[in-house]
């Protein structure tokens, strides 16, 4: 059965909306963990627009599950990751003007520098995932640079505006998951997945873990984190 990694970035977004000291992302992480989350995800962006280094350190200290740190593949962020030592680092592209991560890493054109980051993280005992579009050549490159896993970018599928586009994008995800599995990569999926779109993944056993944040935090505002996480877990268990 696929696992659930809960991203608590948008708890920090709510905090930053008022420049307040609350809500505390670590408290949300503990609540998600208590509800059954298999891992906690945070994206430490270079502009620190939501999660900051203190958040990451506190979350790592208090949770018992895995901490997954999303970050750009830059020397400065590498140094921070080596200091924080999360269980896993997911390397993601980053643009300051974007609202959220807009696409996967381009390994074809940047494999040399990203490979150096992968090697440094793995030498420190940190698992490495690559956030990647469902493109077969990109996935093959992730294998060549010795990543442990990939996270398939599901945004194009989740944001599809018609059935034709939805089917086309989901076929790309299926093909990507299967080639990743054949290459002995662990295969995760994330970005834009909500309580409706998760249902499409029924029968796609190649997905090891779903990384979901915004939809869970949005529901948690109305129902509480415990209920929001348990509702998503129930849908994943039914896949």
Curated annotation (Swiss-Prot):
Molecular functions (GO terms): pyridoxine 5'-phosphate synthase activity
UniProt key word Transferase: yes
Keywords annotated in UniProt: Cytoplasm, Pyridoxine biosynthesis, Transferase
Chief place of localization: cytoplasm
Annotated 3-amino-2-oxopropyl phosphate binding sites: 7, 18, 192, 213-214
InterPro entries reported for this sequence: Aldolase_TIM, PyrdxlP_synth_PdxJ, Pyridoxine-5'_phos_synth
Pfam families tied to this protein: PdxJ (PF03740)
Pathway: Cofactor biosynthesis; pyridoxine 5'-phosphate biosynthesis; pyridoxine 5'-phosphate from D-erythrose 4-phosphate: step 5/5
Site (Transition state stabilizer): 151
Record localization: Cytoplasm
Enzyme nomenclature, EC number: 2.6.99.2
Example GO biological process: pyridoxine biosynthetic process
Active site: 43 (proton acceptor), 70 (proton acceptor), 191 (proton donor)
Record field: catalytic activity: 3-amino-2-oxopropyl phosphate + 1-deoxy-D-xylulose 5-phosphate = pyridoxine 5'-phosphate + phosphate + 2 H2O + H(+)
Binding sites annotated in the UniProt record for 1-deoxy-D-xylulose 5-phosphate: 9-10, 45, 50, 100
Enzyme class, broadest EC rank: transferase
Keyword Transferase applies: yes
GO CC field: cytosol
Summary of subunit composition and partner proteins: Homooctamer; tetramer of dimers.
Function noted in UniProt: Catalyzes the complicated ring closure reaction between the two acyclic compounds 1-deoxy-D-xylulose-5-phosphate (DXP) and 3-amino-2-oxopropyl phosphate (1-amino-acetone-3-phosphate or AAP) to form pyridoxine 5'-phosphate (PNP) and inorganic phosphate.
Family: Belongs to the PNP synthase family.
This protein's name: Pyridoxine 5'-phosphate synthase
Gene that encodes the chain: pdxJ
């Amino acid at each position: 059965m696929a696992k659930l990694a809960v991203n608590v970035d948008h708890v920090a977004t709510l905090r930053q909306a008022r420049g307040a000291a609350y809500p505390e992302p670590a408290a949300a992480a503990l609540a998600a963990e208590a509800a059954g989350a298999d891992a906690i995800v945070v994206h430490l962006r270079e502009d620190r627009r939501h999660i900051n280094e203190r958040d990451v350190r506190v979350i790592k200290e208090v949770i018992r599950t895995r901490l997954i740190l999303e970050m750009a593949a830059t020397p400065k962020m590498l140094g921070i990751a080596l200091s924080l030592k999360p269980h896993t680092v997911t390397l993601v592209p980053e643009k300051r003007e974007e609202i959220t991560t807009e696409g996967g890493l381009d390994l074809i054109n940047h494999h040399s520098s990203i490979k150096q980051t992968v090697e440094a993280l793995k030498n420190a005992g940190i698992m490495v995932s690559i956030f990647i579009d469902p493109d077969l050549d990109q996935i093959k490159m992730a294998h060549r640079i010795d990543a442990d896993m990939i996270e398939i970018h599901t945004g194009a599928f989740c944001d599809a505006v018609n059935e034709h586009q939805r089917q086309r994008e989901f076929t790309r995800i299926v093909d990507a998951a299967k080639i990743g599995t054949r290459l002995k990569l662990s295969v995760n999926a994330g970005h834009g997945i909500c309580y409706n779109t998760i249902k499409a993944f029924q029968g796609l056993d190649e997905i090891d873990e779903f990384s979901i944040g915004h939809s869970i935090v949005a529901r948690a505002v109305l129902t509480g984190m415990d209920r929001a996480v348990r509702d998503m877990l129930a849908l994943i268990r039914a896949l």
